[in-house]
Amino acid sequence: QMCIRDSNFECLLHEKPFAGVNGSGKHDNWSLVTNTGKNLLSPGKTPYDNKQFLLFLSAVIAAVDDNAALLRMSASNPGNDHRLGANEAPPAIISIFLGEQLEDIVEQILQNGTATHSNKGERMDIGVHTIPPIKKDATDRNRTSPFAFTGNKFEFRMVASSMSIAGANTVLNATVADVLQSM
């Protein structure tokens, strides 16, 4: 009340989008870490040979694939449903983006039963001779995938700004645990 009286501000308890204003959402950075601090989704220097990482990566992929509707529901409300697919938001369908390096490893495993190498990140030469080529990030930087691997975690980009991430995390934790139990 003091803020309104003193500054002539008003408070809207509604998330965007509004006409002419992009939507609001949040990015839920999700990973699996042991009680000793080991990140189970850390690819390491040789992700193609990191069996523990590949096991947990495949469990997450299977969980999201098998339970896409549940995951979608965990991020759903009327304002957010209006935002998704427009207003600088990811599409309203669940898909996973792994990045070029991990996609190549998964393709090798699917075709050959094993992976023997991984593509190294490319280097960008920006054309300035005093600046050396910069290592290009091999993960998703364009923000168009609702569920993207970003280095050592997944980023779930569908959750509404007005929602807690607890629902989405509960779905992720339970469905990944279910897949791991069945392996």
Regions found by a protein language model. Name each.
Residues 35-40:
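Glycine-/small-residue-rich beta-strand-loop submotif within the FAD-binding core of flavoenzymes
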Residues 14-31, 79-85:
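Beta-rich nucleic-acid/ligand-interaction surfaces
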Residues 2-4:
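Short, small-residue-biased leader/transition segments that mark boundaries at the very start
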Residues 15, 32-34, 158-160:
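Active-site proximal loops enriched in glycine and acidic residues that flank catalytic Cys/His/Asp
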Residues 7, 41-183:
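C-terminal accessory/tail domains of diverse enzymes
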